[in-house]
Amino acid sequence: MTLVSPGPIHGVRSATAVICDAALEYGQLEVVVNMSQMTVSQMTLTSEGESHQHRLHYLAEHVLNWSGVPVVHIRPTVFLDNPLFTWFAVPALRERDLLVLPFGTGRTSPIATSDVARTVAAVLVDPAHGIGDVYELTGPASLDIDGLATENALGLRRPIRGTDIPHETWV
């Protein structure tokens, strides 16, 4: 079984808790592959710098661990095919050869969904091997806006410049 989103159901009950309950009642589940998020590795119960969705991933991991369900956590960074890097970036790439994103001094290492899929498939083929493990998946390099622009330039075979934009302007 693969769990992707720990979204809330009926207030305080979460999909994660319902899945754990069903898995324990069924009793024959080999593994739950939980698709989490890389930020979870830096979080604590009292940390405040992350989004609501990141907090839900953090809590979902703990619920799965506490439940006794056989689980493997997959923690990818942002997906390379995330709309942030595709749909939202396309107009400026097409019209001005610019990658315009609200990155500031930030860096990221986007990962291809196909790489994540291969990891999940490997876990599902041999689930007993990884029970209790956490796989943190990243792309090949940690890039700033200029590095992302360089990668786009290689793929598009034309010069692309990276341009930071304030988040307030971008949204």
Task: Kindly give the residue locations of the regions a language model identified.
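Oxidoreductase cofactor-interface core, primarily capturing Rossmann-like NAD(P)-dependent enzymes
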Residues: S5-G11, A22-V31, M38-R161, I165, ...
